[in-house]
C-alpha cells in the first residue's frame, strides 16, 4: 500500500461556538450527515463535536486533493467511531469517486482537541 493523500486541518472551537450562537444549527446541517447531526443534537458539548467533525472533513477533502467543492461536499464524508471510540472515516458519492481516481481504498483519521482547538489528520492509502 502507498499513501495517496494527506490532509490536516485545525479549527478554533470558539469560532464554531460563535457561529452556532449567531445562526443556530445552520452550519451543523451543512457539515454533518444525518447520523452525525443526530449525535450533535444529543452531545453534551455540541460546538466541540461540530468543530472536530468540521476539521476532520476539511482534512479529508485536502487529502482527496479537492477541498470542499469541486465535486466533494461535507455530506460525502462521514466521521464515525468504533465501539472503542476510535474515529473512522467513510466516503460516499463525490468523495468516493475522487478516492477511486487516486486508487485509494482506505482512509485513516486522527482527531484531537484541547481547550481552544480541534485538529484532524487524514491519510489515504492505495491498493
Swiss-Prot record:
Described purpose of this protein according to its UniProt entry: Transfers the 4'-phosphopantetheine moiety from coenzyme A to a Ser of acyl-carrier-protein.
A Gene Ontology biological process term: fatty acid biosynthetic process
Protein name per its UniProtKB record: Holo-[acyl-carrier-protein] synthase
Main enzyme class: transferase
Classification of source organism: Bacteria, Pseudomonadati, Pseudomonadota, Gammaproteobacteria, Alteromonadales
Family: Belongs to the P-Pant transferase superfamily. AcpS family.
Taxonomic source organism: Shewanella sp. (strain MR-4)
Catalyzed reactions per annotation: apo-[ACP] + CoA = holo-[ACP] + adenosine 3',5'-bisphosphate + H(+)
Annotated positions binding Mg(2+): 9, 58
Main location as per UniProt: cytoplasm
EC number: 2.7.8.7
Keyword terms of this UniProt record: Cytoplasm, Fatty acid biosynthesis, Fatty acid metabolism, Lipid biosynthesis, Lipid metabolism, Magnesium, Metal-binding, Transferase
GO MF term list: holo-[acyl-carrier-protein] synthase activity; magnesium ion binding
Cofactor: Mg(2+)
Cellular component GO terms, alphabetical: cytoplasm
InterPro entries, A to Z: 4-PPantetheinyl_Trfase_dom (IPR008278), 4-PPantetheinyl_Trfase_dom_sf (IPR037143), ACPS (IPR002582), Ppantetheine-prot_Trfase_dom (IPR004568)
Locations listed in the record: Cytoplasm
Source domain of life: Bacteria
